[in-house]
C-alpha cells in the first residue's frame, strides 16, 4: 500500500494521522519517506551527534510554507518505526525560521484510543518542561555543523495555533 492512501486524519485538525519518518532517540540519521513510492530513504547523516527527542513525521496531504508536508513531533513511551502511522491530537507548535524560511514543528500526542497516558495534555504548556526544553535544544543545534544551514527558534505556540497550522497547510495542498 502506498502511503498516499493514508488520509490527513480522521477529523482535521483535531484528530490527525502522522506518518513517522524518524524514531525517537534513534541514531543521527535523517530519514524521509518518499511520497510517491512510500519507501523510506536516508536523506543524510546528521553532522551533529544528536538524536530526535520525539518521533518525527508528517501529516499527509498537507503543504507547509517550506514546501513540505506539516512536520510533527510525537512523544511516545517507545520509538515508532519509520513508515508507521499513528493517530494523534495536536497540542502545540514550535515556530522556527531556517535557511529555507518559515518552519513550524507541530507537537501531537497519541490519541486516547492508542494511549490514555497523554489525555491530560491538552496544550503545549501541559507537556513536561524538560521535554519542551529538549525539543527546543535539539532544533536550535541540530544543523550547527552543516555548512550553509541555520535555525532560529521563534518560540512555542498553543494547540489552537497547531490546529491552524494543520488546517492552512491542508487547504494549501488541496488548492495547489
From Swiss-Prot:
Record-level Gene Ontology MF annotations: inorganic diphosphate phosphatase activity; magnesium ion binding
Gene Ontology CC annotations of this record: cytosol
Binding locations of Mg(2+) 1: 66, 71, 103
Compartment list: Cytoplasm
EC number in record: 3.6.1.1
GO biological process: phosphate-containing compound metabolic process
Chain sites annotated for binding substrate: 30, 44, 56, 142
Gene3D superfamilies: Inorganic pyrophosphatase
Cofactors (names): Mg(2+)
Pfam family membership, one: Pyrophosphatase
Annotated catalysed reactions: diphosphate + H2O = 2 phosphate + H(+)
Annotated Mg(2+) 2 binding sites: 71
Keyword tags: Cytoplasm, Hydrolase, Magnesium, Metal-binding
Keyword Protein transport (UniProt): no
Entry-linked InterPro entries: Pyrophosphatase, Pyrophosphatase_sf
Family: Belongs to the PPase family.
Self-association state and partner proteins as the record states: Homohexamer.
HAMAP family: Inorganic_PPase
Described function: Catalyzes the hydrolysis of inorganic pyrophosphate (PPi) forming two phosphate ions.
Name this protein carries in UniProt: Inorganic pyrophosphatase
